[in-house]
């Protein structure tokens, strides 16, 4: 896996936008997990990881013009909007290539890393991220999930910034990085999130 800071220069999202290199350890410190699993016999390893993390269901997705058909352009915009999930995002790449962008704590800079065949990637709960194909315009992957796939995208907003899953992610990440954590941040955020949710009823 290769990682670098997204250069923020004009240009299509599928271009590398390659800025300063980022050590893989920095990506791991932000909660991303990565394994290289050979395609030959990958089923056994995937089954073991799915069992350990309690993800009993899976499907295969082909992200390409051919695979998505008329939904292709819409999905490219959809995947690239900054968002988080309340479940891990687990992908095992069977073929093709693409990019994940994740927000660095505490700078909020984008870090981009490329994924390719034989990569198993877990994007943690609560991290802001986005995905795009690269210029190859194709990726095929296995998706693991706990229940019927809903693929709920929780787009970044002031409301989402106080989501309990988001606050817990920040707390754990800052502790891992040795950064100060406000003692009451998670509790206050959970209360505010409850109030926001209640006010919408």
From Swiss-Prot:
Keyword list, A-Z: Amino-acid biosynthesis, Cytoplasm, Dioxygenase, Iron, Metal-binding, Methionine biosynthesis, Nickel, Nucleus, Oxidoreductase
Keyword NAD carried by entry: no
GO cellular component: cytoplasm; nucleus
Presence of keyword Nucleus: yes
Cofactor: Fe(2+); Ni(2+)
InterPro entries given in the database record: ARD, ARD_euk, RmlC-like_jellyroll, RmlC_Cupin_sf
Primary localisation category: cytoplasm
UniProt GO molecular function: acireductone dioxygenase (Ni2+-requiring) activity; acireductone dioxygenase [iron(II)-requiring] activity; iron ion binding; nickel cation binding
Catalytic activities: 1,2-dihydroxy-5-(methylsulfanyl)pent-1-en-3-one + O2 = 4-methylsulfanyl-2-oxobutanoate + formate + 2 H(+); 1,2-dihydroxy-5-(methylsulfanyl)pent-1-en-3-one + O2 = 3-(methylsulfanyl)propanoate + CO + formate + 2 H(+)
CDD domains xref list: cupin_ARD
EC number(s) on file: 1.13.11.54, 1.13.11.53
A GO biological-process term: L-methionine salvage from methylthioadenosine
Localisation per UniProt entry: Cytoplasm; Nucleus
Broadest EC class assigned to this enzyme: oxidoreductase
Cofactor note: Binds either 1 Fe or Ni cation per monomer. Iron-binding promotes an acireductone dioxygenase reaction producing 2-keto-4-methylthiobutyrate, while nickel-binding promotes an acireductone dioxygenase reaction producing 3-(methylsulfanyl)propanoate.
Pfam name, any one: ARD
Binding sites annotated in the UniProt record for Ni(2+): 83, 85, 89, 129
Family named by the database record: Belongs to the acireductone dioxygenase (ARD) family.
Function: Catalyzes 2 different reactions between oxygen and the acireductone 1,2-dihydroxy-3-keto-5-methylthiopentene (DHK-MTPene) depending upon the metal bound in the active site. Fe-containing acireductone dioxygenase (Fe-ARD) produces formate and 2-keto-4-methylthiobutyrate (KMTB), the alpha-ketoacid precursor of methionine in the methionine recycle pathway. Ni-containing acireductone dioxygenase (Ni-ARD) produces methylthiopropionate, carbon monoxide and formate, and does not lie on the methionine recycle pathway.
Name the record gives this protein: Acireductone dioxygenase 2
Protein's gene: ADI1-2
């Amino acid at each position: 896996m290769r990682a670098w800071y997204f250069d923020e220069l004009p240009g299509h999202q599928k271009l590398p936008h390659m800025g300063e290199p980022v050590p893989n350890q920095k990506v791991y410190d932000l909660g991303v997990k990565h394994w290289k699993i050979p395609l030959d016999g990958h089923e056994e390893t995937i089954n073991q990881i799915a069992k350990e993390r309690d993800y009993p269901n899976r499907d295969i997705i082909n992200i390409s013009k051919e695979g998505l058909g008329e939904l292709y352009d819409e999905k490219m915009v959809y995947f690239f909007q900054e968002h988080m999930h309340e479940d891990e995002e687990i992908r095992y790449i069977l073929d093709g290539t693409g990019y994940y962008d994740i927000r660095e704590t505490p700078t909020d800079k984008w870090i981009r890393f490329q994924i390719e065949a034989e990569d198993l990637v877990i994007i943690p709960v609560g991290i802001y991220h986005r995905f795009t194909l690269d210029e190859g315009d194709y990726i095929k992957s296995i998706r693991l999930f706990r229940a019927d796939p809903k693929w709920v995208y929780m787009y970044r907003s002031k409301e989402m910034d106080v989501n309990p899953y988001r606050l817990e992610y920040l707390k754990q990440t800052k502790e891992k990085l040795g950064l100060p954590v406000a003692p009451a941040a998670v509790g206050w955020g959970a209360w505010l999130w409850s109030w926001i949710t209640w006010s919408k009823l």
